[in-house]
Swiss-Prot record:
This is Leucine--tRNA ligase. Keywords: Aminoacyl-tRNA synthetase, ATP-binding, Cytoplasm, Ligase, Nucleotide-binding, Protein biosynthesis. It comes from the Bacteria. ATP binds at residue 613. InterPro entries: aa-tRNA-synth_I_CS, aa-tRNA-synth_Ia, Leu-tRNA-ligase, Leu_tRNA-synth_edit, M/V/L/I-tRNA-synth_anticd-bd, Methionyl/Leucyl_tRNA_Synth, Rossmann-like_a/b/a_fold, tRNAsynth_Ia_anticodon-bd. Disulfide bonds: none annotated. It comes from Streptococcus pneumoniae serotype 19F (strain G54).
Length: 833
């Protein structure tokens, strides 16, 4: 057989690995550890697509490489299995979301195993397993005990027709719900919050210690949004009331010509004049219909209403009007801002819209034309005139503190984490509310609080989750006869994914989240690979929970993930017509290397786009494995380009990777393999070992594969192959194409054992030294010849060889040599006349 029969070989080795538990996590305490983590998937009904294996293959290559280097490797997989799609499916079909989820997991697992990933399936976790979410609930009870989980009335997007609140992302720009197109209103509801803000400073500072992409760290820094400025107190004219604004530029206070409160601010009704009451009430109602996202859109037209009241500017005593506007959010800062229209574009647009004064306090711009947002020396600012930004801020803060109308303040953009959902398919929150007004956490001995099985998962209609319909589960009585109700909200999908990497370390422990010694052994995660779309929320939440568990003494490290790598996106093949509109792949035919619309005959342009069901360009890995083999898919996805690049899927590229594997198969099975080394491949082999080793370490898998191809080309030029080089090459390709490597290893090594733990090959540095080197010969400054010569020849020897070359002789024939300049290992320059 002169080709790689993947249909026979791949299932054979997958069966062997499963039967022998080949990838069971090593526990030899004398070995170093390596923890390679994938972002575990949500097991959707659609199954895996070819984007999933890109990151999974990367961690698998590293895991196989580290095993061969003598490491204990922890390389697990599990399921982020709670989530809205399963609940929606259950509501639409009447099926149990647990059954639907179990079927999806079985399909995902089948697909993953068909790709030859070296996961330790003994450590599989599932966020919907009560034995798992017992510890999710345990973490929540600890947060509750420490005052970091609390209840609050917060405004939510309420849809009366759906009987539930929906997320900001589910509200359409016209203020209706994405599902059903129903009206959405903002109304306060009791919600569970987690006090992530208590960790803001640590979450920010500890980013500096992480080997993460700088772009991801910047996204987290911006999300946390630390601002140093001042709180300034404004009194309301003619009343005993006052309000506080936070500003990062207290030095511009002399330019504050109006103030703006959020429509929901607690002072609004109290200070609104009778003449303005109707306009204010109408505006408040309109604001309640908009999502926070829509309200803060910089591009939207500025709207607002004057309350009829005035504030007193504390620095100059001037009366300035108090407005309400929906771009100010009650949940952000103090829910009030001072407006300096000369130096803030949004304030400037608002002032122009409503004909409010604009006073320049920083020189350098033309504030009649636009806000001047650069720095400049202060003007029109009394005791701040002539000062720069830093000097003026220090002086005004000292003045505000002395006068008792302000103080220096650090604030964060980060808000506390809204942790409850009015849904069925999630972890029950282990809290009981008693009729005497107290609430208590479910004791650890009674965890897990198991999600009850029910067919009735429709919304309750009261704003509570469907669990409110289940009276038997809901109502409890204490030993002293006091009645209580269980919490009906469930946890968000983020909960189970915030700590799953810890459970992999000790997945069957019934006494604790994980054993302390094992956590010390394995943490932190050495590399975490996943999509950049999780840059903020998941990674920030996981870091928060980890730091909390560190404070409890549960985990030994301050951070969970030492190195993070975001793989790129695999784009689908798609086509555009002359208008730029995308055409579905089933409407395209290929003729003579070009693409045409089946119905119109129009020639189409090929253009990569995100894979989507609507474009019919999603590639199923099952189809690729069937036609080309799992090893081909693995090699192709790693060879497409840099791991972090977004690259279009190509059938031709897939075929090229398959041809390469067939060449590898023929090289090892057809070439005569000898016990003696004739030295012909010394340099090529040692170069390949060195390059592949270094490139795997730096995740440059595409260049590692290119180097493997270089070796195959060199080996094919020789009649015979030295056995140690054949073995070493098979080991080098094993992390990329493990099934092929296992099969070839048996033909060469004849040990009957897996290649997985055979020691990684090493290279001989002395064999990398070049014996020969190319030099150029220049005549009158122009290159006339290139010669291969022995390395490190003297100037005289170089000159002698150059002048003896036939091409050079012809060029200088009949000419007088003025001088010859020789530079060893580089060039010979002959000057003639």
């Amino acid at each position: 057989m002169s080709f790689y029969n993947h249909k026979e070989i791949e299932p054979k080795w997958q069966g062997y690995w499963a039967e022998h538990h080949t990838f069971k996590t090593g526990t030899d305490a004398s070995k170093p550890k390596f923890y390679a983590l994938d972002m575990f998937p949500y097991p959707s009904g659609a199954g895996l697509h070819v984007g999933h294996p890109e990151g999974y293959t990367a961690t698998d290559i590293l895991s196989r490489y580290k095993r061969a280097q003598g490491y204990n490797v922890l390389h697990p997989m599990g399921w982020d299995a709670f989530g809205l799609p399963a609940e929606q499916y259950a509501m639409d079909t009447g099926n149990d979301p647990a059954e639907f989820t179990a079927e999806n997991i079985a399909n995902f697992k089948r697909q993953i195993n068909a790709l030859g990933f070296s996961y330790d399936w003994d450590r599989e976790v599932n966020t919907t397993d009560p034995n798992y979410y017992k510890w999710t609930q345990w973490i929540f009870t600890k947060l509750y005990e420490k005052g970091l989980a609390y209840e609050a009335e917060v405004p939510v997007n309420w849809v009366e027709e759906l009987g539930t609140a929906i997320a900001n992302e589910e509200v359409l720009p016209d203020g209706t719900s994405e599902r059903g197109g129903y009206p959405v209103v903002r109304k306060p509801m009791r919600q569970w919050m987690l006090k992530i803000t208590a960790y803001a400073e640590r979450l920010l500072n500890d980013l500096d210690e992480l080997d993460w992409p700088e772009s991801i760290k910047d996204m987290q820094r911006n999300w946390i949004g630390k601002s140093t400025g001042a709180n300034v107190t404004f009194k309301v004219k003619g009343t005993d009331k006052e309000f506080t604004v936070f500003t990062t530029r207290p030095d511009t206070l002399f330019g504050a010509t109006f103030t703006v409160l959020a429509p929901e601010h607690e002072l609004v009704d109290a200070i609104t004049s009778s003449e303005q009451a109707e306009a204010v009430a109408n505006y408040k109602h309109q604001a309640s219909l908009k999502s926070d996202l829509a309200r803060t859109d910089l591009a939207k037209e500025k709207t607002g209403v004057w309350t009829g009241a005035y504030a007193i500017n504390p620095v100059n005593g001037k009366e300035i009007p108090i407005w309400i506007a929906d771009y100010v959010l009650a949940s952000y800062g103090t829910g009030a801002v001072m407006a300096v229209p000369a130096h803030d574009q949004r304030d400037w647009e608002f002032a122009k819209q409503f004909d409010l004064p604009i006073v320049e306090v920083l020189e350098g711009g033309n504030v009649a034309e636009a806000a001047y947002t650069e720095d400049g020396l202060h003007v029109n600012s009394d005791f701040l005139d002539g000062l720069n930004k830093e000097e003026a801020i220090a002086k005004i803060v000292a003045w505000l503190e002395e006068k008792g109308c302000g103080q220096e303040k650090v604030t964060y953009r980060l808000r506390d984490w809204l942790f409850s959902r009015q849904r069925y398919w999630g972890e029950p929150i282990p809290i009981i509310h008693w009729e005497d007004g107290t609430s208590t956490a479910v004791p650890e001995s009674e965890l897990p609080l198991v999600l009850p099985v029910t067919k009735d998962i429709r919304p309750s209609g009261t704003g509570e989750s469907p669990l409110a319909n289940l009276t038997d589960w809901l109502e409890v009585t204490r030993a002293d006869g006091v009645k209580g109700r269980r919490e009906t909200n469930t946890m968000p999908q983020w909960a189970g994914s915030s700590w799953y990497y810890l459970r992999y370390i000790d997945p069957h422990n019934t006494e604790k989240l994980a054993d302390e010694d094992l956590l010390k052994q394995w943490l932190p995660v050495d590399i975490y690979v996943g999509g950049a779309e999780h840059a903020v929320l998941h990674l920030l939440y996981a870091r928060f929970w980890h730091k909390f568990l560190y404070d409890l003494g549960v985990v030994p490290t301050k951070e969970p993930f030492q190195k993070l790598f975001n793989q790129g996106m695999i784009l689908g093949t798609s086509y555009r017509d002359h208008r730029g509109a995308l055409v579905t792949t089933d409407k395209v035919e290929k003729r003579d290397g070009s693409f045409f619309h089946v119905e119109t005959g129009e020639e189409l342009e090929q253009a990569p786009a995100k894979m989507s069901k609507s474009l019919k360009n999603v590639v199923n890995p099952d189809d690729v494995v069937e036609q080309y083999g799992a090893d081909t898919l693995r090699v192709y996805e790693m060879f497409m380009g840099p791991l972090d690049a977004s690259i279009a899927w190509s059938e031709e590229g897939l075929e090229g990777s398959r041809k390469f594997l067939d060449r590898v198969y023929r090289l090892i099975t057809s070439k005569e393999i000898l016990a003696e080394n004739n030295g012909a491949l010394d340099k090529a082999y040692n170069e390949t070992v060195k390059a592949v080793t270094e490139q795997i370490e730096s995740l440059k898998f595409n260049t590692a594969i290119a180097q493997l191809m270089v070796f195959v080309n060199a080996a094919n030029k020789e009649d015979k192959l030295y056995v140690d080089y054949a073995k070493g090459f098979i080991q080098l390709i094993a992390p990329f194409a493990p099934h092929l490597a296992e099969e070839l290893w048996q033909t060469v090594a004849e040990t009957g054992e897996s290649i997985s733990y055979v020691a990684w090959p090493t290279w001989d540095e002395s064999k990398l030294v070049e014996d020969e080197i190319e030099i150029v010969v220049q005549i009158k400054g122009k290159v006339r010849a290139k010669l291969m010569v022995a390395k490190d020849l003297s100037r005289e020897e170089l000159q002698e060889i150059a002048l003896a070359d036939e091409k050079v002789k012809a060029e200088i024939d009949g000419k007088e040599i003025v001088k010859v300049i020789s530079v060893p290992n580089k060039l010979v320059n002959i000057v003639v006349k």
